[in-house]
Amino acid sequence: MGKCQVISHPLIQHKLSILRRQDTSTKDFRELVNEIAMLMGYEVSRDLPLEDVEIQTPVAKTVQKQLAGKKLAIVPILRAGIGMVDGFLSLVPAAKVGHIGMYRNEETLEPVEYLVKLPEDIDQRQIFIVDPMLATGGSAILAVDSLKKRGAANIKFVCLVAAPEGVKKLQEAHPDVDIYTAALDERLNDHGYIVPGLGDAGDRLFGTK
């Protein structure tokens, strides 16, 4: 079973509390999502493998460490996942970015996929799926399904806020996928929103309703 790790760094928790506020502006919301994503990036990349490499400094030759193994890919679930991409790219600017587009059927609460655009070598990459919220788990499961159909095997799911119901469903559907979140909230309400949550992340990021 994949782990679900709550990243409780003080800076992340402070920024998340501001993000949740109803009166946080679109501009501030967008900036906070980017900042929290960057801070989370340090934690979710903690186990990336390193290798020795010989370099020449201005003074002498020396053996130092650099990232080894698989290259990285950031895959946001559209729309809201876009807000987390730049935070990750500020840490790993060479990472490729794919996109998986989905919308939620408001009657069934089930996700509907409308776009999949991925790097050609996605099967050779360590993948971070990013989406601010893990609610029912439907979008996350469908995103992992789409990636695995294309040969991807090393996948992590990164969100800002998760509901226990979504975590459980994703772990049951894909026990090999680790989940990283800044908060594990109480529950889902009857409309499939996380409580206390932060509202509709996509609308708050882009100033839409």
Curated annotation (Swiss-Prot):
GO terms, molecular function: GTP binding; magnesium ion binding; uracil phosphoribosyltransferase activity
Positions of uracil binding: I194, G199, D200, A201
Pfam families the record matches: UPRTase (PF14681)
Annotated EC: 2.4.2.9
Pathway: Pyrimidine metabolism; UMP biosynthesis via salvage pathway; UMP from uracil: step 1/1
Catalyzed reactions per annotation: UMP + diphosphate = 5-phospho-alpha-D-ribose 1-diphosphate + uracil
Classification via SUPFAM superfamilies: PRTase-like
Residues binding 5-phospho-alpha-D-ribose 1-diphosphate: R79, R104, D131, P132, M133, L134, A135, T136, G137, G138, S139, D200
Cofactor note text: Binds 1 Mg(2+) ion per subunit. The magnesium is bound as Mg-PRPP.
Entry superkingdom: Bacteria
Database matches in InterPro entries: PRibTrfase_dom (IPR000836), PRTase-like (IPR029057), Upp_B (IPR034332), UPRTase/APRTase (IPR050054), Ura_phspho_trans (IPR005765)
Cofactor: Mg(2+)
Regulation of this protein's activity per its record: Allosterically activated by GTP.
GO biological process entries: UMP salvage; uracil salvage
Similarity section: Belongs to the UPRTase family.
Entry function: Catalyzes the conversion of uracil and 5-phospho-alpha-D-ribose 1-diphosphate (PRPP) to UMP and diphosphate.
PANTHER family in UniProt: ADENINE PHOSPHORIBOSYLTRANSFERASE (PTHR32315), URACIL PHOSPHORIBOSYLTRANSFERASE, CHLOROPLASTIC (PTHR32315:SF4)
Protein name, as recorded: Uracil phosphoribosyltransferase
